[in-house]
């Protein structure tokens, strides 16, 4: 039987077709290793499950952290990916909000809606969910994905909706908005904001910070191409910290005080320590970046400055707000998308995304039909 299955899988790869009941998937194979494999199509396991046929997905910086070995909960053999748009293929007996054929946005966070944490709006720590897609259970970089707690982990979108735009609402926009903008208290109009890192998260923080009319937004990065995008999206000042001392520049701009809110959108010790030098007394540092190494916290300098430091894993409590903002054209997620690839070129897509400074990549869209 195993020999026969191996023949089927080999034939499927050679013919670039997949037999019924099987699907293509990108699989994590240990630190630094990933490969395209033929996998069985997922099946309903619990009454609240839905099976979604994935139409579009994308690659997240967190996927790169998994490949670096920074996420020990993700073990070899796991299908990667936690973002996407698709069509409901099948539902469990307990699913009441969706029917086969519905087009849906897949949230990066799975939430039961019933446990203590979900009742507090801390969906990322749901006792049966949280960030499990592409981490503790198989994810969205595949032909199909099983979504637990479907009624509270999927969002219906119009049949004619732009799929690429809505993929940006799975993770990157809610993460930047909740963990950066809201945690950073940017909702106070007129305040000064510095965003360290102008990748997809930093640019998403820029887009959503503008909801609240901050007095000034300063973007800091080492990549002139990304800084040019930031300027186009509304940054008031851009600073290349490979060429200039960002602390001195920010102090000049703010009359020596620093900024009211700093959003860390990189996830390196150097970026976090830079944030500590940029924040004004009474200000806030909102950490969004995923850190795989320890960071020095300079309390000897900060203890008397009334500084708040926040951390958060996205809870996707703002997804409905952002859906409405996109539908009303208050925000254009296309501005975050730089590349499109068919699934057959997903390894090239990963390489392009990982070498963003050379390729100019922001978010890349993977079309599962290709």
PLM regions and their residue ranges:
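C-terminal hydrophobic helical "lid"/dimerization subdomain
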Residues: 2-23, 273-277, 316-370
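Glycine-rich cofactor phosphate-binding loops and adjacent beta1-alpha1 units
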Residues: 4-7, 184-189, 212, 228-308, ...
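Short Gly/Pro-enriched turn/cap motifs at secondary-structure boundaries
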Residues: 16, 29, 41-42, 75-81, ...
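Glycine-rich beta-strand-centered segment in the early N-terminal region that forms part
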Residues: 40-57, 68-116, 158
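Residue-level recognition of short, solvent-exposed, well-ordered loop/turn junctions
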Residues: 45-46, 99, 188, 280, ...
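NAD(P)H dinucleotide-binding glycine-rich loop of Rossmann-like/cofactor-binding domains
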Residues: 112-196
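Mid-domain Rossmann-like dinucleotide-binding core that forms the NAD(H)/NADP(H) cofactor-binding site
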Residues: 161-244, 248
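Residues in the short beta-alpha loop(s) of Rossmann-like NAD(P)-binding domains
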Residues: 223, 291, 315
């Amino acid at each position: 039987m195993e020999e026969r299955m191996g023949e089927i899988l080999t034939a499927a790869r050679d013919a670039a077709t997949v037999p019924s009941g099987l699907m293509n998937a990108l699989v994590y194979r240990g630190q630094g290793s990933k490969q395209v494999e033929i996998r069985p199509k997922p099946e309903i396991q619990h009454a609240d499950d839905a099976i979604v046929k994935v139409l579009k997905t994308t690659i997240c910086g967190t996927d790169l952290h998994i490949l670096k070995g920074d996420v020990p909960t993700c073990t070899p053999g796991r299908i990667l990916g936690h973002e996407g748009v698709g069509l409901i293929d099948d539902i469990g007996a307990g699913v009441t909000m969706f029917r086969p054929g519905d087009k849906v946005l897949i949230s990066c966070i799975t939430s039961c809606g019933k446990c203590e944490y979900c009742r507090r709006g801390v969906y990322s720590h749901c006792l049966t969910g949280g960030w499990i897609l592409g981490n503790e259970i198989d994810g969205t970089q595949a032909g199909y994905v099983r979504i637990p707690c479907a009624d509270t982990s999927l969002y219906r979108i119009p049949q004619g909706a732009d799929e690429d735009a809505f993929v940006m609402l799975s993770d990157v926009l809610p993460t930047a908005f909740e963990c950066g903008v809201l945690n950073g208290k940017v909702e106070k109009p007129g305040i000064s904001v510095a965003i360290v890192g102008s990748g997809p998260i930093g640019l998403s923080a820029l887009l959503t910070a503008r909801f609240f009319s901050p007095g000034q937004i300063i973007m800091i990065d080492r990549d002139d191409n990304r800084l040019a995008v930031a300027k186009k999206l509304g940054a008031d000042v851009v600073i290349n910290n490979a060429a200039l001392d960002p602390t001195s520049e920010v102090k000049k701009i703010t009359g020596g005080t620093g900024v009211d809110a700093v959003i860390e959108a990189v996830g390196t010790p150097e970026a976090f320590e830079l944030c500590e030098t940029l924040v004004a007394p009474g200000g806030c540092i909102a950490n969004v970046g995923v850190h795989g190494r320890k960071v020095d916290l300079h309390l000897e300098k900060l203890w008397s400055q009334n500084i708040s430091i926040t951390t958060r894993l996205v809870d996707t409590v703002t997804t409905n707000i952002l859906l409405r903002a996109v539908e009303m054209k208050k925000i254009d997620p296309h501005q975050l998308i730089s590349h499109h690839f068919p699934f057959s070129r997903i390894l090239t897509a990963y390489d392009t995304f990982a070498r963003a400074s050379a390729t100019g990549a922001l978010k890349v869209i993977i079309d599962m039909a290709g």
